[in-house]
Structures are given as structure tokens and as C-alpha cells.
């Protein structure tokens, strides 16, 4: 069971637990996060401080879990969390932090390493897991049986660099951010490439929007781009285009219901916010910065609602 703390307990304890001999502990400050704009609750995870936490709209920590590495998260409709504590697993925990399901990565057919950098609980109850090193997407049931497997086109598989985020599309395909290849690629369920866009940098994320365009977090490309099905850039934010903000390694991106864009700005240093909300007109209307609890390696952040 994970250690999950209330705000009172959080201020008194050292966060961490022992998980398969590799869980790391760290003392976490009770200093307040800095938010600009309308305050909101945020799930954020940083592998420098070894911490995943929900920070409330009052900037107080609601709960926390110790981690080693993390590149993805999903808040499920029943209040559970699908996350990871290392690149070798996917873990589901309930709202109290109790582990209810776990998937551990194995080895490739040749005995090589496999890392996990993306996962999703699907509407049919299966769990999608992208296996880097094995160069495939698998869908597994609660018993961890592979129900479906999709091969990915990766010339030289690399456990750490094959993929970053993978997201399902409305038509049942998968949109894959291939970090090493610098390509966002859509695969059908047989593994056939049906669309791709050459980003030209170590991209982290690609999300298919309701309008059919694709929103891409370009990683070390230091920008966010929205491209059409015809591969035309329709909207973008460049590295130094936002007033008072420099974009660094762009990880998670999403289009919010209000039409604004969610941007996670990793490795940007304490002079810059770690998370931003930006209007179509490129105005920053909300930001989050916390270099006390978190560090300069915060790739994962999503809005949080109970």
C-alpha cells in the first residue's frame, strides 16, 4: 500500500515507501505553490523530487505518493488513479492510496529491457500499455492477459526512446509520439500507419482534437503546435513567444473545454512556471510553479477534479 497523507500529516512526515526495493524517500516542504489566475487543483509528478501529489486550489497538498520515475497518469471516473512509480510498471490505486491492480513490464523476445511511458484505461475496461523496447502497444485485461497487440514501426527499438505518450483516437486508432524518430504517427489496429507528422524534435505528446487537428508537445523543440490532417501548422507557441515565460521541454499538452491549451513546461528552471494555461490568442491566463515540493523534472501534470 502506498503512503497517502492528509495535509496535516503531510507537514509532519517524510514521504516515501518501499516498493520492490527501489522506492525512494524524500523530505517534502510545506511551502505553498505559486498560482496565477483562477486557482485550481492540480495533480503533478516530478522524478527529481520523487513525488506525485495533488495540490489543491488553496495550494495545500491533499495527498501524495512517492515515485521513482513517471511519464503518464490518468484519473479514472471512479476516483482511482492509473499511474506509475517507475518506467517498469503501471499501478492502479484507489482514492485512499491502496493498490488494486499492477502490471509489470517483462522482457523482449530477445531478453532485452522494456520500459513503459504511456498507458490508458480504455472505455471497454482494458488497459492500453505502450511497451518501448518491444515496439508495440498492448491491451490487457484485469488478469493482465494480452487481448490485443499492435506492432509499431520502429527500425531500432530502444526501451527508453521508442515512445512517449500514446493516446487513443475517436476512430479506435492510436496516436503515438515517437521520441527517437521525432514523429507523431497514427496507427490502425493492425499496426498500419494511416497518418504521420515529422516534428523534427524529441516530441513527448500528440493529442487528436475534436476538430480533427493534432496538438503536439514537441519536447526539446521548445514549442506547441497544432497541425491539420493535411499537415499544415495552424497554430503554435514558440519558445519565447509568451510574455515572461520561456518554454523548455514541452511534455503534456491538451485542449481544455474552454478552448485554452494546457502546457507542461519541464526543465525550464525556477524562473518559469511548470504548468501553463494559454488562450488561443497566446495569453497566459493561469500558471503553476512550485520548486519547493517539486523540482526541475516535472513532466506530468493534469487538472484535478474530485
What is the role of each PLM region?
Residues 1-10:
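N-terminal secretory signal peptides that target proteins for export/translocation
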Residues 5-6, 20, 24, 182:
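Generic secretory/membrane-interface signal
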